[in-house]
Amino acid sequence: MEIMDSGEPFLQWDKNLSELSEAGENDILYSTHFTDLLDDLSQEALLGQLLSDPFLSGRGDAMDTEEELTRASPVPPHIQAEHSYSLCGDSRPQSPLSHLPGEPGSDAADSESDEWPMEQEDKGIKMEPLLCVPLPALTLTVTPAGSAPEPVIDSCDSAQSLSLPQVKEDSNSPQIKLEPHEVDQFLNLSPKGLECLQMPPTPPSSVGSDSEGSQSPVHPCAPASPTQTPAVLKVAPRAPSSLSSSPLLTAPHKLQGSGPLLLTEEEKRTLIAEGYPVPTKLPLSKAEEKALKKIRRKIKNKISAQESRRKKKEYVDALEKKVETCSNENHELRRKVENLECTNKSLLQQLHSLQAVVAGKVPRSCRVTGTQTSTCLMVVVLCFSLFLGSFYPGLSPCSSITKADLSREISIHDSYTTTVKSRSLLSIQEPGGLDEPHPIGLGGEYPEWDRQADVMAAWRFEQQHKEEEAELHKAEHRPLLLSTNETHAQKAILIDLHTHRSNETAKVIQLDRTVNETS
């Protein structure tokens, strides 16, 4: 804004700020001229107030001046903080007659006192909610013309800088030129201060661009091109910072005041692509300002989208590297598993071979052990039977044979002593004929001649063989002397019977021979 002395002592308000409102909001307009509100103040008084308290003096004078200025003016509405090309969170205007946000007296409670009237006949200010976000501490400089010193006030946490409007004084015609650092406080941030602000890693809708609620409706006087050709932006990767420091956007302080307007190539290209005229002079008209806001918003959205794509690409690259490392580890683990499987197979083969060898050896030993066990059992049983046989001769298998032998000897002695009986027996057998063999009589009288009984009794008679032979020789001589007139068959039978006791095989052969001879 400018306040110029043009011959008559009155103040003139710049129209750059007043044209920010919409045309259809005439119900909340202020028809009172800004100069009418300041009629009671002269140029000298206003100059004294500007050079006195707001930045150099104490807080009390500034409060008094503010009360005097705001006592006669109605309460204006607040302006929303974020517009198309604003990056500031504070919606209060920049004015030398109001408190700065960094001063102790300016806070959310004093927001009603930070008011400023505007010169407007048929236009008003759009009522929008206030975002109570205070600015960081500021560094303020006052630069008067001539040889006046330059007082500088540094706050404790100076992160942003604002240049105080320059005051030019002449002896004859004093001219006061008030040039805020930016068009309104919507554009008040310097590149140095913005370096401290880091752009959050969020989608493009939250990086310094206007929200949908704060966008002004598009007037038909600014037609858009039916074929939009979006410009391809190539921005080198950079550290997260505010979009206002981008070389694709014009600095906000260059959009204020009057004079030639220098836009960036990207802004010019976007304006031409959208079908808007390229502004070259300041101040901007309402249509030019709306078009500039629109294309600046689009450029910021493009920049934020590129930043988002860059971050996404970095994230995807990191994930790809991680996947590659994981795949390499997986391949190594697969190789190890294959080696372990091969080792396991070889060990299983060795185990099966060892089991086969052990299975081949175990049955042989078991067979040997079984044979030895059966042999031992048979030997034990035999010894036990012999032991019992020696103690109990009546239970031995040869006891019946012995008894039969004794009865045979008794019968033989009886037959030889009583020759008449034997003759009668022989005479009884004679009618049957001597031609037929008579084995039944032999078996009945001498049951001990059976082959099995003789075999079992042979080993019992070995010790008594000599005694029996002597007795047999005596018995043989007796029948020869007593019965000399007996038949040849009877003698042969008796001889064969006595010789059978000495030799078992000879008995059977001689018995058959005698039977054949009789036949």
From Swiss-Prot:
Domain called bZIP: residue spans: 291-354
InterPro entries: bZIP (IPR004827), bZIP_sf (IPR046347)
Lumenal domain ranges by topology: 396-519
A matching Pfam family: bZIP_1
Chief place of localization: endoplasmic reticulum
Compositional bias (Low complexity): 205-217, 240-249
Positions of the UniProt region annotated as Basic motif: 293-322
Compartments, as annotated in UniProt: Endoplasmic reticulum membrane
Glycosylation sites noted in the Swiss-Prot or TrEMBL record: 485, 503, 516
Sequence motif S1P recognition, residues: 423-426
Region of interest called Leucine-zipper, as start-end residue ranges on this chain: 333-354
CDD domains: bZIP_CREB3
Gene Ontology cellular component annotations, sorted alphabetically: endoplasmic reticulum; endoplasmic reticulum membrane; nucleus
Entry annotated with the keyword Nucleotide-binding: no
Membrane topology note: Single-pass type II membrane protein
Residue spans of biased composition, Acidic residues class: 109-119
Post-translational modification: Upon ER stress, translocated to the Golgi apparatus, where it is processed by regulated intramembrane proteolysis (RIP) to release the cytosol-facing N-terminal transcription factor domain. The cleavage is performed sequentially by site-1 and site-2 proteases (S1P/mbtps1 and S2P/mbtps2).
GO molecular function: cAMP response element binding; DNA-binding transcription factor activity, RNA polymerase II-specific; transcription cis-regulatory region binding
Membrane spanning stretches: 375-395
This protein's UniProt keywords: Activator, Developmental protein, DNA-binding, Endoplasmic reticulum, Glycoprotein, Membrane, Nucleus, Signal-anchor, Transcription, Transcription regulation, Transmembrane, Transmembrane helix, Unfolded protein response
Region listing for Disordered, in residue ranges: 58-77, 85-121, 193-261
Role, per record: Transcription factor involved in unfolded protein response (UPR). In the absence of endoplasmic reticulum (ER) stress, inserted into ER membranes, with N-terminal DNA-binding and transcription activation domains oriented toward the cytosolic face of the membrane. In response to ER stress, transported to the Golgi, where it is cleaved in a site-specific manner by resident proteases S1P/mbtps1 and S2P/mbtps2. The released N-terminal cytosolic domain is translocated to the nucleus to effect transcription of specific target genes. Plays a critical role in chondrogenesis.
Similarity field: Belongs to the bZIP family. ATF subfamily.
Subunit structure: Binds DNA as a dimer.
Designated name of the protein: Cyclic AMP-responsive element-binding protein 3-like protein 2
Organism per entry: Danio rerio
